[in-house]
């Protein structure tokens, strides 16, 4: 280039290259953010991912898979047919080993144990029951089998319990007391029970006497007593559906008669069916008033001796059948 031209154009061609303009405003911010994101992605791709060790799988003999890796075993385990539809039974979650045991079943098993009945017998002995035959019978007969399942927890308490149809099962102490009074240390051949109820007292009597006759006027209770006694396989009890105030003249005389209901007096028919030297035990008195456990002994064909003993409370003695 001539000197004259150089003077007119003082800048060379390379001097005319412009520097790129820096982005301005929001466009600049977005571009900067994009550049930073690309840099992070590039850095992440450059770092190799940590690979989990691969454990070779072994084939099970029957087509399953043995996996040394528990996680993989759980992941690849084949589901049982219908497993998704089946729900855990019994209300407890599967695999929950800390689930509470069946309290009702545990309670029932405890009630059937001999130790529970023995504690009841010890209380009877402490309250004055001394006849070893009566104590052994009370220990042997499972009272909880004669009450409703909902009352089983109270079966060996000294309490009268409802059995339906406005009737009750007598307290163990009263049952033992009446049987001991009726036996009086004698060997009993024939015993008549008035008021079978659920069958418990008849079962106890069957272990003290050779033959037991029992009358129940309420048909559903008569049927229930048969069902209750059947599992015990008691061979010497004869149940009758009928009017207890009439007794069983065809089977008389009886060494002992036990009446499990209270009347204003003892029915004459029952006194006549008592053997000479026999003993009758019955509650006597009004339903709303005082009832007294009464012992009647037949000392001669036309002579009876009466003793009034303990205050008690029984359901009323009624005539007829229902």
Curated annotation (Swiss-Prot):
**Catalytic residues, chain numbering:** 170
- The residue ranges flagged as biased composition, category Low complexity, are 33-51, 67-91
Q: What is its main location?
A: cytoplasm
Which reaction is catalysed here? [protein]-L-isoaspartate + S-adenosyl-L-methionine = [protein]-L-isoaspartate alpha-methyl ester + S-adenosyl-L-homocysteine
UniProt entry tagged with the keyword Thylakoid: no
Q: What class of enzyme is it?
A: transferase
Query: One GO term of the cellular component aspect?
Result: cytoplasm
Q: Which GO terms describe its biological process?
A: methylation; protein modification process; protein repair
Chain spans, region Disordered = 1-101
Q: Entry's Gene3D superfamilies?
A: Vaccinia Virus protein VP39 (3.40.50.150)
Indicate, by first and last residue, each region the UniProt record lists as having compositional bias (Basic and acidic residues): 14-29
EC id:
2.1.1.77
Molecular function (GO) terms for this protein are: protein-L-isoaspartate (D-aspartate) O-methyltransferase activity
**Which cysteines are disulphide-bonded?**
none
- Annotated InterPro entries: PCMT, SAM-dependent_MTases_sf
- What keywords is this UniProt entry annotated with? Cytoplasm, Methyltransferase, S-adenosyl-L-methionine, Transferase
Transmembrane stretches in the record are none
The record's subcellular location field reads:
Cytoplasm
The similarity comment for this entry is: Belongs to the methyltransferase superfamily. L-isoaspartyl/D-aspartyl protein methyltransferase family.
Give the protein's biological function: Catalyzes the methyl esterification of L-isoaspartyl residues in peptides and proteins that result from spontaneous decomposition of normal L-aspartyl and L-asparaginyl residues. It plays a role in the repair and/or degradation of damaged proteins.
This chain belongs to the protein called Protein-L-isoaspartate O-methyltransferase
Instruction: Report the source organism.
Output: Burkholderia pseudomallei (strain 668)
């Amino acid at each position: 280039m001539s000197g004259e031209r150089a003077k007119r154009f003082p800048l060379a061609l390379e001097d005319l290259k412009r520097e790129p303009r820096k982005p301005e405003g929001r466009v600049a911010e977005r571009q900067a953010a994009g550049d930073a994101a690309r840099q992070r992605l590039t850095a992440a791709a450059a770092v190799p991912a940590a690979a989990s060790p691969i454990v070779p799988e072994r084939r099970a003999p029957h087509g399953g898979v043995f996996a040394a890796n528990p996680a993989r075993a759980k992941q690849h385990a084949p589901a049982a047919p219908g497993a998704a539809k089946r729900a855990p039974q019994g209300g407890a979650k599967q695999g929950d080993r800390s689930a509470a045991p069946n309290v009702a079943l545990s309670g029932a098993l405890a009630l059937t144990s001999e130790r529970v009945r023995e504690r009841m017998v010890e209380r009877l002995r402490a309250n004055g029951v001394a006849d070893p035959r009566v104590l052994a019978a009370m220990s042997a007969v499972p009272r909880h089998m004669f009450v409703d399942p909902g009352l089983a927890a109270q079966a060996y308490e000294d309490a009268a319990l409802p059995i339906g149809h406005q009737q009750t099962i007598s307290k163990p102490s009263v049952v033992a007391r009446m049987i001991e009074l009726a036996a009086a240390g004698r060997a009993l051949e024939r015993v008549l029970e008035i008021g079978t109820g659920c069958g418990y007292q008849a079962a106890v009597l069957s272990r003290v006497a050779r033959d037991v006759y029992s009358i129940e006027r309420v048909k559903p209770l008569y049927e229930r007593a048969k069902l209750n006694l059947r599992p015990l396989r008691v061979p010497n009890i004869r149940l009758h559906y009928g009017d207890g105030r009439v007794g069983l003249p065809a089977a008389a005389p009886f060494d002992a008669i036990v009446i499990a209901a209270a009347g204003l007096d003892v029915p004459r028919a029952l006194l006549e069916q008592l053997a000479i030297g026999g003993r009758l035990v019955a509650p006597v008195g009004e339903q709303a008033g005082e009832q007294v456990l009464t012992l009647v002994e037949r000392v001669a064909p036309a002579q009876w001796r009466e003793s009034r003993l303990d205050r008690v409370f029984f359901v009323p003695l009624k005539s007829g059948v229902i």
